């Protein structure tokens, strides 16, 4: 079960992940054995970019990150992909190596949607997740290609190694939820892991990027399904996993 993690609404929305250059596919044969018992989750590490301050004051979220529902939402939900344990561990260790420790509150993750409305959880969100997950087979992914963000580094998935499969799942969900998605969630999507962000020193980021380019050998894994987290008054709480069908 996931641990609770405090984070601001805007941090949950992931607004700082701005690509500086697009990833290019890379060939890599590194293999990792999947484990079907893993749950991707938020860790209880030092908090990342807490924009509420020590007093716990809640800032009004930007309209870009707000679901298009008729009333203000008491809670929103974050949807990520669920991967095997070994793949998740390797990417999390890489994130811990490069992400500023005082800001790193999360384990490695690929976010599909940042602010799903809690008011539609039982009516639309979970039924759609169950339907699409039941019709989707587990698939291979390869975290292969490092690329720059404005203030950090990410690792992308080649189209033929999980990129297209992840995008297809995202597009199905996006079509089903088009009436209420936030502007951010209704926009474009490119599957990636963020391993460094929120670093203002361009020289530091570039040096780290060059090191990652030199040392990163890729990481194979298996996408087992989807994980849903509740954003609730500063906490990211694991809610439910939606498993894909076995690949064979």
Model-derived regions, located:
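Histidine-dependent nucleotide/RNA phosphoesterase domain, centered on the 2H-phosphoesterase fold
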Residues: 2-248
């Amino acid at each position: 079960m996931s641990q609770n993690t405090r984070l601001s609404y805007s941090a949950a929305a992931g607004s700082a992940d701005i690509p500086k250059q697009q990833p290019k596919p890379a060939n890599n044969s590194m293999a990792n054995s999947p484990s079907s018992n893993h749950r991707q989750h938020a860790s209880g590490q030092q908090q990342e970019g807490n924009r509420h301050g020590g007093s716990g004051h809640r800032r009004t979220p930007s309209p870009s990150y707000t679901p298009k529902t008729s009333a203000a939402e008491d809670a929103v939900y974050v949807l990520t992909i669920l991967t095997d344990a070994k793949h998740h561990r390797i990417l999390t260790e890489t994130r811990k190596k490069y992400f500023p420790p005082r800001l790193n509150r999360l384990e490695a993750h690929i976010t599909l949607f940042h602010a799903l409305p809690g008011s539609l959880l039982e009516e639309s969100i979970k039924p759609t997740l169950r339907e699409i997950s039941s019709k989707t087979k587990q698939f291979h992914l390869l975290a292969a290609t490092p690329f720059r963000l404005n203030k950090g580094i990410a690792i992308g998935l080649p189209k033929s190694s999980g990129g297209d499969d992840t995008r297809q799942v995202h597009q199905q969900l996006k079509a089903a939820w088009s009436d209420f998605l936030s502007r951010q969630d209704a926009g474009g999507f490119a599957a990636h892991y963020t391993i460094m962000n929120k670093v203002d020193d361009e020289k530091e980021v570039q040096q780290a990027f060059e090191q990652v380019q030199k040392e990163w050998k890729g990481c194979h894994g298996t996408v087992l399904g989807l994980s849903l987290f509740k954003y609730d008054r500063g906490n990211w709480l694991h809610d439910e996993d939606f498993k894909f069908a076995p690949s064979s």
